[in-house]
């Protein structure tokens, strides 16, 4: 049994990119679907397909190199990290995104700042 399914998803994406795989499959949950939708919206992955019990992510490459250079899980089950609206970090000086779980759902840092909400800082992607 997994203790941190979000970290597992990020690790699967990282490993698939390092192995230059075209697709990766992760077990399905609402939180992971929201994360995948944000990654697609921000241009880090090409496509998201939900199948019964799993989510299939089509990874994106530019000139043979992965579009995602790094993934970092911030808030972990043993140490939760919460940020207010004014404390949302800029990832890699604005070249990356952070993803938050807010009272209005899962959203990236820019959307959370525009909506004037803070929340749990799930991960950073650059």
From Swiss-Prot:
<keyword id="KW-0689">Ribosomal protein</keyword>
<keyword id="KW-0694">RNA-binding</keyword>
<dbReference type="GO" id="GO:0003735">
    <property type="term" value="F:structural constituent of ribosome"/>
</dbReference>
<dbReference type="GO" id="GO:0006412">
    <property type="term" value="P:translation"/>
</dbReference>
<dbReference type="GO" id="GO:0019843">
    <property type="term" value="F:rRNA binding"/>
</dbReference>
<keyword id="KW-0687">Ribonucleoprotein</keyword>
<protein>
    <recommendedName>
        <fullName>Small ribosomal subunit protein uS8</fullName>
    </recommendedName>
</protein>
<dbReference type="GO" id="GO:0005840">
    <property type="term" value="C:ribosome"/>
</dbReference>
<keyword id="KW-0699">rRNA-binding</keyword>
<dbReference type="InterPro" id="IPR000630">
    <property type="entry name" value="Ribosomal_uS8"/>
</dbReference>
<dbReference type="Pfam" id="PF00410">
    <property type="entry name" value="Ribosomal_S8"/>
</dbReference>
<dbReference type="InterPro" id="IPR047863">
    <property type="entry name" value="Ribosomal_uS8_CS"/>
</dbReference>
<comment type="subunit">
    <text>Part of the 30S ribosomal subunit. Contacts proteins S5 and S12.</text>
</comment>
<comment type="function">
    <text>One of the primary rRNA binding proteins, it binds directly to 16S rRNA central domain where it helps coordinate assembly of the platform of the 30S subunit.</text>
</comment>
<dbReference type="GO" id="GO:1990904">
    <property type="term" value="C:ribonucleoprotein complex"/>
</dbReference>
<dbReference type="InterPro" id="IPR035987">
    <property type="entry name" value="Ribosomal_uS8_sf"/>
</dbReference>
<comment type="similarity">
    <text>Belongs to the universal ribosomal protein uS8 family.</text>
</comment>
């Amino acid at each position: 049994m997994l203790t941190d399914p979000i970290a597992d998803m990020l690790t699967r994406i990282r490993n698939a990119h390092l192995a230059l795989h075209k697709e990766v499959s992760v077990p399905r949950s609402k939180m992971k679907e929201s994360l995948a939708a944000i990654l697609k919206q921000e241009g880090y992955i090409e496509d998201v397909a939900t199948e019964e019990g799993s989510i299939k992510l089509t990874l994106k490459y530019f000139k043979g190199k992965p579009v995602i250079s790094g993934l970092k899980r911030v808030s972990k089950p043993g140490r939760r990290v919460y940020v207010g609206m004014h404390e949302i970090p800029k990832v890699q000086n604005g070249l990356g995104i952070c993803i938050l779980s807010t009272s209005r759902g899962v959203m990236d840092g820019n959307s959370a700042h525009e909506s004037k909400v803070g929340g749990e800082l799930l991960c950073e992607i650059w």
